[in-house]
């Protein structure tokens, strides 16, 4: 089966300058996602989509393929789906390659490993999902903010259960998205159809979007 991973890695970033190449534990941030993809036993093609030559050079050195995207697909407001479209069109035109499964791996999740990826894809196949995403689960109570107060979303405070028996809440962590290519083409969305959820440990769900996040994960890795 042809399983393609697409790693979006644009040069611009509001929170951290050239974030995808920032050094984390003596390695560029890009390293962790590229290596997780290359070490996967299921993914058989790894492509980094970028507009930046330094990022492209680093990706090639790490062993990934590179597809350079136009600047209009590398702005702060650019959506991910057109980037996926661009990669698919490029691979079809220049390599006559059409994947059956698309896996989207974001560099902001450096603690996601090849094991996580393979477990998610195995679950997707086993349960016959059209798409799957990763996240973490917590047994907790949710509240909604209204104009002048808050109200519980999923329980009655007068009959409050113990936390362990509260509803399991699922939170997306952005580390893994996978979908059948035919579903992506039909829906124009990274996840669609029958969607599955792969649970990752909370401590592996770090997401780097700011200097504060970067400091936190450096501290975590040091310990």
Q: Where are these predicted regions, by residue range?
A:
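N-terminal nucleotide-binding beta1-loop-alpha1 segment
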Residues: 1-17
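A short, N-terminal amphipathic alpha-helix
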Residues: 29-45, 57-58
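Catalytic donor-sugar/metal-binding loop of nucleotide-sugar-dependent glycosyltransferases
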Residues: 186-206, 211-223
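Conserved core of the sugar-phosphate nucleotidyltransferase
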Residues: 82, 107-201
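Short active-site oxyanion
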Residues: 42-47, 203-205
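Conserved SAM-binding loop
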Residues: 22-23, 48, 104, 206
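Short, high-confidence coil segments that cap the C-terminus of an alpha-helix
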Residues: 43, 97-99, 128-129
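Short phosphate-binding loop-to-helix
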Residues: 53-103, 112-115, 119-122
């Amino acid at each position: 089966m042809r399983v393609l991973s697409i790693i979006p890695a644009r040069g611009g970033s509001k929170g951290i300058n050239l974030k995808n190449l920032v050094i984390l534990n003596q390695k560029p941030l890009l390293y962790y996602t590229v290596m997780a993809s290359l070490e996967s036993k299921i993914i058989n093609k790894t492509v980094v989509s970028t507009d930046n030559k330094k990022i492209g050079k680093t990706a090639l050195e790490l062993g990934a393929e590179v597809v350079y995207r136009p600047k209009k697909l590398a702005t702060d407001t650019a959506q991910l789906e057109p980037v996926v479209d661009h990669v698919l069109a490029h691979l079809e035109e220049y390599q006559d390659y059409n994947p059956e499964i698309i896996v989207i791996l974001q560099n902001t999740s450096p603690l996601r490993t090849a094991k996580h990826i393979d477990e998610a894809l195995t679950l997707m196949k086993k349960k016959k999902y059209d798409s799957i995403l990763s996240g973490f689960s917590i047994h907790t109570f949710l509240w909604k903010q209204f104009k002048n107060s808050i109200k519980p979303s999923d329980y009655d405070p007068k009959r409050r259960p113990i936390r362990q028996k509260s509803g399991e809440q699922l939170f997306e962590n952005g580390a893994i998205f996978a979908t059948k290519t035919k579903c992506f083409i039909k829906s124009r969305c990274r996840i669609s159809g029958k969607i599955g959820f792969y649970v990752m440990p909370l401590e592996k769900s770090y997401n780097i979007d700011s200097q504060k996040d970067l400091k936190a994960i450096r501290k975590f890795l040091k310990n």
